[in-house]
Amino acid sequence: MSRLRIFDDHTPDTPFFVSKEQTQITAELHKIGITFERWEATQAIEPGATPEQVMAAYRADIDRLIATHGFKTVDVVSIAPDNPKREEMRAKFLEEHFHKEDEVRFFVAGSGLFTVHSGNKVYEIECVKNDLIAIPDGTQHWFDMGAAPYFVAIRFFTEPDGWVGHFTGTDIAQRFPRYIPEGCQSAH
């Protein structure tokens, strides 16, 4: 289940807001310019589905976003716990950074934790299957896929180079807890 926790940036162990309610999550994130939606597949996605099958299942929503936002590239990323590069991939996203384009991800399966630093607040957003998140360009954030990552996500890009992070050099991401998916154990 999706979850939003909001912290003051100096109190990483004490959220002042916690919700698993879709309408509350959407409303809180909208205040800082983040889009958060739930999508439903038009056809079943089977384990081992190809990227083409994944995109076909969500074609109407993908086309709507492309038309609305002018995305030039769409792809599918799939990470499993046995991926030999999982630690390297996790480390790449764990430091606070921003992009010069919106970061838009739709979770087809699995989960991950986006954490946004906006003003003096930190928004921890657990994204799960059927969640779409769009983080505006210039927004400082980090992403944690967990130590045993499992997710399949559709990624949208306006830049042909794909993912390009501009790191802030701050240590804020290190001060906040790491992601442990619900059901594994409590991360916080």
From Swiss-Prot:
Q: Which cofactor does it need?
A: Fe(2+); Ni(2+)
Q: Where do the annotations place Fe(2+) binding?
A: H97, H99, E103, H141
SUPFAM superfamilies, per this entry? RmlC-like cupins
Q: Name one GO molecular function term.
A: iron ion binding
- In which pathway is this protein known to take part? Amino-acid biosynthesis; L-methionine biosynthesis via salvage pathway; L-methionine from S-methyl-5-thio-alpha-D-ribose 1-phosphate: step 5/6
- Which chain positions carry the site (Important to generate the dianion)? R105
The feature of type site (May play a role in transmitting local conformational changes) is located at D102
Q: Which GO terms describe its biological process?
A: L-methionine salvage from methylthioadenosine; L-methionine salvage from S-adenosylmethionine
Question: How is the co-factor bound, per the entry?
Answer: Binds 1 Fe(2+) cation per monomer.
Q: Which residues are annotated as site, described as May play a role in metal incorporation in vivo?
A: E96
Q: What is its EC number?
A: 1.13.11.54, 1.13.11.53
Known catalytic reactions = 1,2-dihydroxy-5-(methylsulfanyl)pent-1-en-3-one + O2 = 3-(methylsulfanyl)propanoate + CO + formate + 2 H(+); 1,2-dihydroxy-5-(methylsulfanyl)pent-1-en-3-one + O2 = 4-methylsulfanyl-2-oxobutanoate + formate + 2 H(+)
Enumerate the UniProt keywords alphabetically. Amino-acid biosynthesis, Dioxygenase, Iron, Metal-binding, Methionine biosynthesis, Nickel, Oxidoreductase
Q: Give me the residues that bind Ni(2+), please.
A: H97, H99, E103, H141
Question: Per its UniProt record, what PANTHER family does this chain match?
Answer: ACIREDUCTONE DIOXYGENASE
Which family is it part of? Belongs to the acireductone dioxygenase (ARD) family.
Subunit structure comment from the entry: Monomer.
Relate the protein's function as given in its record: Catalyzes 2 different reactions between oxygen and the acireductone 1,2-dihydroxy-3-keto-5-methylthiopentene (DHK-MTPene) depending upon the metal bound in the active site. Fe-containing acireductone dioxygenase (Fe-ARD) produces formate and 2-keto-4-methylthiobutyrate (KMTB), the alpha-ketoacid precursor of methionine in the methionine recycle pathway. Ni-containing acireductone dioxygenase (Ni-ARD) produces methylthiopropionate, carbon monoxide and formate, and does not lie on the methionine recycle pathway.
What is the protein name given in its UniProt record?
A: Acireductone dioxygenase
Q: In which organism is this protein found?
A: Xylella fastidiosa (strain 9a5c)
Encoding gene, per UniProt annotation:
mtnD
